[in-house]
């Protein structure tokens, strides 16, 4: 299924964290934190400025981003879990 976000919304796929600590301890699913890192899968056209002009988004498809633990809205498409969030929910781009 193809999905194109509208306006300043972004489709992000979470990057799963390690299931083992550096010391070799296996972390059970119940103790794992939600990942705050993800890969941008699709972006909208941008947001409208106060003057009515379109302001393009800074993030682009393929960027690795950091976001707040509870950011975005969880959706499921084609058996995969994604987040739909606004550009304001993204804290930064990993380079």
Swiss-Prot record:
SUPFAM superfamilies to which the protein is assigned, alphabetical: GroES-like
**One GO term of the cellular component aspect?**
cytoplasm
Top-rank taxon of the source lineage equals Bacteria
Give the family this protein belongs to, as stated in its UniProt record.
Answer: Belongs to the GroES chaperonin family.
UniProt KW keywords: Chaperone, Cytoplasm
Which protein is depicted? Answer: Co-chaperonin GroES
Assembly with partners or alone: Heptamer of 7 subunits arranged in a ring. Interacts with the chaperonin GroEL.
Q: Which InterPro entries match?
A: Chaperonin_GroES, Chaperonin_GroES_sf, Chaprnonin_Cpn10_CS, GroES-like_sf
Where does this protein chiefly localize? cytoplasm
For this UniProt entry, the molecular function terms from Gene Ontology, in alphabetical order, are: ATP binding; metal ion binding; protein folding chaperone; protein-folding chaperone binding; unfolded protein binding
> Briefly, what is this protein's role?
Together with the chaperonin GroEL, plays an essential role in assisting protein folding. The GroEL-GroES system forms a nano-cage that allows encapsulation of the non-native substrate proteins and provides a physical environment optimized to promote and accelerate protein folding. GroES binds to the apical surface of the GroEL ring, thereby capping the opening of the GroEL channel.
Q: What NCBIfam families does this protein map onto?
A: PRK00364.1-2, PRK00364.1-5, PRK00364.2-2, PRK00364.2-4, PRK00364.2-5, PRK00364.3-3
Q: Which cell locations does it reside in?
A: Cytoplasm
GO biological process terms, semicolon-separated: chaperone cofactor-dependent protein refolding
The record, for PROSITE patterns, names: CHAPERONINS_CPN10
